[in-house]
Curated annotation (Swiss-Prot):
Signal peptide: none annotated. It catalyses: Exolytic cleavage of the (1->4)-beta-glycosidic linkage between N-acetylmuramic acid (MurNAc) and N-acetylglucosamine (GlcNAc) residues in peptidoglycan, from either the reducing or the non-reducing ends of the peptidoglycan chains, with concomitant formation of a 1,6-anhydrobond in the MurNAc residue. Its EC number is 4.2.2.n1. It comes from Buchnera aphidicola subsp. Acyrthosiphon pisum (strain APS). The gene is mltE. This is Membrane-bound lytic murein transglycosylase E. One of its GO terms (molecular function) is peptidoglycan lytic transglycosylase activity. The lineage of its organism: Bacteria, Pseudomonadati, Pseudomonadota, Gammaproteobacteria, Enterobacterales. CDD domains: LT_MltC_MltE. Keywords: Cell wall biogenesis/degradation, Lyase. PANTHER family: ENDO-TYPE MEMBRANE-BOUND LYTIC MUREIN TRANSGLYCOSYLASE A, SOLUBLE LYTIC MUREIN TRANSGLYCOSYLASE-RELATED.
């Protein structure tokens, strides 16, 4: 009777330890999977500060992926009277067609929209308060609509630039760095800056903005 009691206690203790070990193993397994998922997710979303990280492995993959957005781009380009090729070029260079791209400066999605700048500006122009959420900007249709609307705004802002190729590059640089940052490289006066730009060829304009020369080459369309 005494031995049976000891046996039962030891058996229960054994079962308890076995259950604990099992739960511990399951917990470790879940933790390991979670770490792998988070690591992959962070690699998928994040980019380096100075160089956009392409999620896709080669240009062929990127171009195939860009085809996914052709219909949205065509519809949105027609809506805002913006060249489809310009939109595609920005998507290609800014995100490689990855709708979940996110930079450390909080530029989001296919056209790398910053909620606090381009996003808020487009909202203001459309009579809306606030700014788009990050989740909204991960949606390809919303992202392309806001990005193209912002390009349309820049087209109107630079309408006085006579050379259309130069105007296109001015729009691209302003899209990436901001209008004020672009114009201030020429003059503190907006009018004077535009006058200087109007004396330039596409090549001399790109030479002037040396820090954006590589981007200009990427955007040749």
């Amino acid at each position: 009777m005494f031995q049976s009691s000891i046996y039962n206690k030891n058996y229960k203790k054994f079962l308890k330890n076995l259950k604990y070990q099992g739960e511990y193993a399951v917990t470790l397994g879940i933790l390991a999977i979670s770490i792998l998922l988070l690591t992959g997710f962070n690699q998928f979303l994040n980019t380096k500060p100075t160089l956009k990280k392409n999620y896709f492995l080669n240009q062929k993959s990127i171009k195939n992926t860009l085809k996914n957005w052709n219909d949205i781009i065509a519809t949105t380009a027609n809506k805002y009277k913006v060249d489809e090729k310009l939109i595609k070029s920005i998507v290609y260079v800014e995100s490689s067609g990855n709708p979940y791209a996110k930079s450390q400066s909080n530029a989001i999605g296919l056209m790398q929209i910053k909620p606090s700048s381009a996003g808020a500006e487009v909202y203001r122009l459309n009579g809306k308060k606030g700014r788009p959420s990050i989740q909204e900007l991960y949606d390809p249709k919303t992202n392309i609509d806001i990005g193209t609307s912002y390009i349309s705004f820049l087209q109107k802002k630079f309408i006085s630039i006579k050379n259309k190729d130069v105007m296109r590059y001015a729009i691209i640089v302003a899209y990436v760095n901001g209008t004020s940052a672009l114009l201030k490289t020429f003059s503190k006066s907006r009018k004077e800056a535009i006058n200087i730009i109007n004396t330039m060829t596409k090549k001399s304009f790109c030479t002037h903005i040396k820090k954006n020369t590589r981007q200009c080459k990427h955007f040749v369309i």
